[in-house]
Amino acid sequence: KFAQSFVGHINGGLALVCVLVACFFAAISGSGPATVAALGGIIIPAMTSVGYSKGDASALMATAGGIGIIIPPSISFVVYSSIANVSVGTLFMAGIIPGLLMGFSLFAASMWVTRKAKLDRVPKATAGERIDAFKDAFWGLMMPVIILGGIYGGIFTPTEAAAVAAIYG
C-alpha cells in the first residue's frame, strides 16, 4: 500500500512497486530467494491483472529479488565475512551504494520498458492517503534502519541484530 500510493499511478507504476517492495523486503530478510518466494505470489498476479505478461512480471520479480544479495543485511555477506575473516559491518557498508544503484537502475529500466505500454493504472493517491500509508508502514520501514544502524553504530553484533529483528518483527 505504501509503495503503491507513491508510484502506483504512473505508467509502469506497478513495476516500480515491485522493485521498491522487493528492495525493502530484501533489506529486512537479507535473502533474494526469500524475497521472491514471499512477494512473487502477490505481486505477479497483481501485475498480470493490469496488463503485464506473466513472463515479464516473473522476470522483474526475479530480478528485483536478486538485488537482495547486495542490500544489507545480506546473508551472503555474513557467510563471506565468517569465511574470509572480514568485518560484516564493513561488508554491509560496502553493499549499500551498489544495492541502491542496482535498485535505481532497475527502476529506470522498468520505466523505459513500460513507457509506451498501455497498462492500467491505480488512481493517484491523495496527500492524506499517502500520509496514512506512510504511518501504516513506518515501523516496518524502520526495521532496516534499526538493524543496520545498530550494527554500523557498534550497538550490537550481527548475531544480536538477528535477535533484535526477531523481537522487533
What are these regions (language model features)?
Residues 1-169:
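Alpha-helical transmembrane segments of multi-pass membrane transport proteins
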